[in-house]
């Protein structure tokens, strides 16, 4: 017979529950552990110090939550596709290890991609790189995009097509927007500046906004302290969870800068004249506007021919040292079902009864899977800058076009502006813990085209930009 009744609590092994804690809580938890370990009651108290819960990772890292919810969306999409499991159009095949899979039905093939996207390492971070490793995130997104494309190619037999969904995508209780075409998948977070948090280029199965926000980790203090810990012969064998990573790279503390907003695209900034490339790149500048991480209103207009116009608008303020000035920002995005470039129209209007001067710009954070030369580089107005690599810092004036290109995977992104811009560019690096020590990881490149604004009472300022994504053979070099 049973010895008794027991209900097991949710949990995992000790280290996992510690890693899942938010930064401040983990610092306090580690301090409490160190204090209690010196007391006689340690052995009796240890079982009650549980730390966090695995799903805290989805709160701690919005990038993990986004990926997790994308995975759930694909699962629902597969289940709602229908029981017939229609095969995709003729000529569509799914490549695996160099061989075409047999046509077993769309649902089964998409479900296989779903399962591949669920490989757990990419959804969290502990002593290994996990979520901080871009190639792991890329692999998960690749399978998600591939699975979605299988469903969509069968659901939409006639091209071109455009569809959108307005729903709570990230589980925060607020509505977001997803717009898709045969070529693109666009994911907007309305309550975070109507920012574009994911751009899927579906022909190459890649998310181009595969970037991590720089945020503090409890182990960063060891880097600042220059702490090295080599095992003593008398300490005995340690598990991998007990080992202290060795700081084997000099200067990692120079990359410990933290962001106060999530790195994405179409982030709208207002700056003062004292802001510069270095302070902006280190996120140590003064933000004058209240648009970057605040809510925008949305209006969707369906055009003839299956086209969409997405209109995001916010009335906010520029917080000058002398006081606030009301201002509105409207960004209209025109989306077509074919492979035409995205067209973005900005309108900034001063709502104040007096003239104002400021700097306005929109930030892009993009990752073309690597920073290293010679395959990955910038072109600015048709020519490579002095230091063109993705990992470079640079400032250029009078810019009408900037191209990011990765020849290794055959993809480019082109931004065009109808008003010449000043362009800042810099890499995003994080410092994370791995089994081999602390390491600097390239997470993407940030571009910030911006303009000097002088607005009179009720005056409007307008900008038109194009965002083109494709493969070099398509249109790179055409003007």
Predicted segments with their positions:
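A cross-taxon signal for low-complexity, glycine/charged-rich
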Residues: 86, 91, 96-97, 104-105
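Acidic-aromatic substrate-binding/catalytic surfaces of carbohydrate-active enzymes
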Residues: 182-299, 317
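Short beta-strand micro-motifs enriched in acidic
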Residues: 189-191, 334-338
């Amino acid at each position: 017979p049973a010895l008794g009744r027991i209900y097991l609590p949710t949990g995992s092994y000790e280290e996992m529950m510690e890693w899942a804690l938010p930064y401040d809580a983990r610092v306090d938890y580690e301090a409490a552990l160190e204090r209690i370990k010196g007391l006689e009651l340690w052995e009796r108290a240890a079982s009650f110090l549980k730390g966090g819960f695995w799903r805290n990772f989805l709160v701690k890292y919005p990038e993990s939550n986004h990926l997790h919810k994308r995975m759930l969306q694909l699962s629902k999409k597969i289940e709602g596709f229908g029981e017939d499991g229609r095969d995709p159009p003729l000529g569509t095949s799914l490549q695996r290890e160099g061989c075409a899979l047999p046509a077993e039905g769309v649902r089964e093939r998409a479900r296989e991609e779903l399962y591949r996207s669920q490989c757990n390492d990419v959804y969290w971070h502990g002593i290994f790189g996990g979520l901080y490793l871009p190639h792991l995130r890329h692999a998960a997104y690749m399978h998600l995009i591939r699975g979605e494309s299988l469903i969509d190619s069968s659901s939409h037999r006639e091209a071109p097509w455009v569809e959108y969904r307005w729903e709570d995508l990230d589980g925060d209780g607020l509505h977001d927007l997803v717009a898709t075409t045969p070529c693109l998948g666009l994911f907007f977070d309305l309550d975070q500046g109507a920012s574009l948090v994911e751009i899927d280029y579906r022909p190459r199965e890649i998310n181009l906004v595969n970037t991590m926000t720089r945020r503090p980790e409890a182990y960063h203090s060891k880097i600042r302290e220059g702490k090295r810990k080599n095992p003593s012969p008398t300490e005995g064998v340690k598990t991998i969870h007990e080992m202290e990573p060795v700081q084997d790279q000099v200067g990692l503390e120079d990359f410990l800068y933290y962001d106060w907003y999530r790195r994405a695209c179409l982030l709208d900034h207002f700056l003062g004249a004292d802001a510069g490339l270095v302070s902006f790149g280190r996120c140590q500048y003064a933000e004058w506007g209240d648009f970057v991480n605040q809510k925008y209103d949305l209006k969707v207009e369906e055009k003839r021919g299956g086209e969409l116009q997405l209109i995001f608008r916010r009335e906010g303020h520029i917080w000058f040292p002398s006081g606030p000035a009301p201002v509105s920002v409207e960004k209209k995005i025109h989306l077509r079902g074919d492979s035409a470039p995205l067209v973005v129209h900005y309108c900034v209007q001063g709502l104040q009864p007096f003239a104002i001067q400021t700097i306005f710009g929109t930030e892009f954070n993009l990752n073309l899977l690597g920073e290293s030369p010679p395959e990955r580089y910038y072109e600015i107005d048709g020519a490579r800058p002095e230091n063109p690599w993705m990992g470079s810092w640079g400032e250029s004036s009078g810019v009408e076009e900037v191209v990011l290109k990765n020849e290794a995977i055959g993809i480019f992104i082109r931004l065009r502006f109808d008003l010449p811009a000043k362009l800042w560019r810099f890499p995003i690096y994080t410092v994370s813990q791995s089994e081999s020590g602390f390491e600097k990881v390239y997470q993407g490149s940030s571009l910030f085209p911006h303009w000097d604004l002088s607005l009179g009472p009720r005056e409007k300022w307008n900008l038109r930009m194009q965002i083109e994504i494709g493969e070099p053979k398509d249109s790179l070099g055409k003007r």
